[in-house]
C-alpha cells in the first residue's frame, strides 16, 4: 500500500463562496474525522491530492500544523461535468488499527472455450484490513469456468491480515451463456413444439 505525504492547511472559512475561492487557488477543501475528536477543516493541494486518489484506498500522511496524521479517503465529491475535486472527507487511522474498506475485484485467465459472458455481480468487496496494509485490489482466477459457474466472496484469495466484512456466500462473479446461444436454443425449442402439433 502506498503512503502519500500532503501538507494540509487549517481552514477557517466555510460555505460555497469560501470553497470556490479555495478551489481557484488549486486547493481542495477537506474535513478530517475520527477517533472521537472534533472534525478538523483543512485545505489540501489539489493536484497532489488528485494524483494520490488515483490509487484506491491510498494512505495519506497529513502534515497539519507540524503534526503528522494518517488518514484514508472516505468520501470524495467531484464536479459532475468537469470531474475536478470539490471536497474530500478523510478518516483518521492509526498504525495497527483495523478499518473496513472497499477493494476492487480483478480477474485473470480465460473462461472455458465458447461464447460465455462474465457478470460482475459485485465489482468491489468490503474487507477489514489494518489501516497501513490495505490492499488496492484482489485478484481471482476465472480460468476454464463454464456457464453456470459462480465465484463467491469466500472463494477469493485475500492478502494476509485481510478478512471479509460481507457475507462469505455473496456471489461476486458468475458465468452466463451468451445471449445468442440462449436465443438459438429457445428458437429450436419453439420449432420442436410447433412440429409436434
Swiss-Prot record:
Keywords for the protein's UniProt record, in alphabetical order: Ribonucleoprotein, Ribosomal protein, RNA-binding, rRNA-binding
A single GO molecular function term of this UniProt record: 5S rRNA binding
Top-level taxon: Bacteria
UniProt entry tagged with the keyword 4Fe-4S: no
GO cellular component: cytosolic large ribosomal subunit
InterPro entries: Rbsml_bL25/Gln-tRNA_synth_N (IPR020056), Ribosomal_bL25/Gln-tRNA_synth (IPR011035), Ribosomal_bL25_b-dom (IPR020057), Ribosomal_bL25_C (IPR037121), Ribosomal_bL25_long (IPR001021), Ribosomal_L25_dom (IPR029751), Ribosomal_uL5_bac-type (IPR020930)
SUPFAM superfamilies referenced in this protein's UniProt entry, alphabetically: Ribosomal protein L25-like
BP GO annotations: translation
Function: This is one of the proteins that binds to the 5S RNA in the ribosome where it forms part of the central protuberance.
NCBIfam families for this protein: bL25_bact_ctc (TIGR00731), PRK05618.2-1 (NF004131)
Family of this protein: Belongs to the bacterial ribosomal protein bL25 family. CTC subfamily.
Subunit architecture: Part of the 50S ribosomal subunit; part of the 5S rRNA/L5/L18/L25 subcomplex. Contacts the 5S rRNA. Binds to the 5S rRNA independently of L5 and L18.
Stated name of the protein: Large ribosomal subunit protein bL25
Species per Swiss-Prot/TrEMBL record: Streptomyces avermitilis (strain ATCC 31267 / DSM 46492 / JCM 5070 / NBRC 14893 / NCIMB 12804 / NRRL 8165 / MA-4680)
